[in-house]
Amino acid sequence: MTNSNRIKLTWISFLSYALTGALVIVTGMVMGNIADYFNLPVSSMSNTFTFLNAGILISIFLNAWLMEIVPLKTQLRFGFLLMVLAVAGLMFSHSLALFSTAMFILGVVSGITMSIGTFLITQMYEGRQRGSRLLFTDSFFSMAGMIFPMIAAFLLARSIEWYWVYACIGLVYVAIFILTFGCEFPALGKRAPKTDAPVEKEKWGIGVLFLSVAALCYILGQLGFISWVPEYAKGLGMSLNDAGTLVSNFWMSYMVGMWAFSFILRFFDLQRILTVLAGLAAILMYVFNTGTPAHMAWSILALGFFSSAIYTTIITLGSQQTKVPSPKLVNFVLTCGTIGTMLTFVVTGPIVEHSGPQAALLTANGLYAVVFVMCFLLGFVSRHRQHNTLTSH
């Protein structure tokens, strides 16, 4: 593979995470405006975003097999067409059914693109380099989470319709579409280069179960937390701009943390540092949830920084549970994380309706505690140490 081709594929991976980050994170900012647009209460409107999350889940789950049937380049180009149709549907329709359909399509496109992005990184890089590359790739999720709430706040404050936020997000996919030209993708399935060595099937082990539960609880906790921070902050008397700044600060700190940990992680055992970070994140979220508005800005910055490496380290450890990284295993852990995304409003919507936004934030805190327990238990069964020893010889 040429260096320029590797760079293009790496940038497609970066932007695939930015696309998903923008679509998922901007929800909390635009939800109130979309609820007004359709004359629905916010708690009811949040349920329609489950279509976005369901699209992401289904596409990541199916793409473990689709990648071997449909070429990756074809998937990305077809995704561009679907993206245009979905954004057009949001802009020109006043129907809630069409809105839900467009959200589902956006989810499908986002899930396919992100699973391709993750696969490309695990395919091109090995060992600890894979972990740091995945972490840097995931930082684009956070970068989008910092930039797009600011864009949304800017547009909404000037009474520009909410659907223009999604048009701006569509520009990320335009960049992915352009990068597919003159770029060679790894061949999979029947098109993959044949080798004489027999393919050895490995059992995944119980460590994959612990990692999958951790991925689900982490994403459900994170998105359950960040989706309701704006409503919680407004309930404490903050303006929409200040609430948006809290969300942007979280993702800015998350992004900086990812860049820092992409270097720091090289010097530590992944399972041990993951356990420490999960414990710290649970404590810091509790400080935010029970603290005063004066301390919220600092606690959310600290939470963003120390939780930044958790999800990517879970995926990296998942890929290291077998000698040869398996696309199906990586996609399985990703799928569990995406189930967390899909359940975000299914779980938190009724909690907010009955007990208010702070109850949703405390629920998220409990989920972070579960992540800590899973990471601690992983220490007794993880295979990543023996596989790292084998690859280093």
From Swiss-Prot:
Subcellular location: Cell inner membrane
Cysteine-cysteine disulfides: none
Keyword field: Cell inner membrane, Cell membrane, Membrane, Transmembrane, Transmembrane helix
Membrane topology category: Multi-pass membrane protein
InterPro entries for this protein: MFS, MFS_dom, MFS_trans_sf, MFS_TsgA, MFS_TsgA-like
MF-aspect GO terms: transmembrane transporter activity
Signal peptide, first to last residue: none
Transmembrane segments: 11-31, 51-71, 78-98, 101-121, 134-154, 162-182, 206-226, 245-265, 273-293, 297-317, 332-352, 361-381
Annotated CDD domains: MFS_FucP_MFSD4_like
Predominant subcellular localization, coarse grouping: membrane
Cellular component aspect of the GO annotation: plasma membrane
PROSITE patterns (alphabetical): MFS
Domain of life: Bacteria
Family: Belongs to the major facilitator superfamily. TsgA family.
Protein's name according to its UniProt entry: Protein TsgA
Species name: Shigella flexneri serotype 5b (strain 8401)
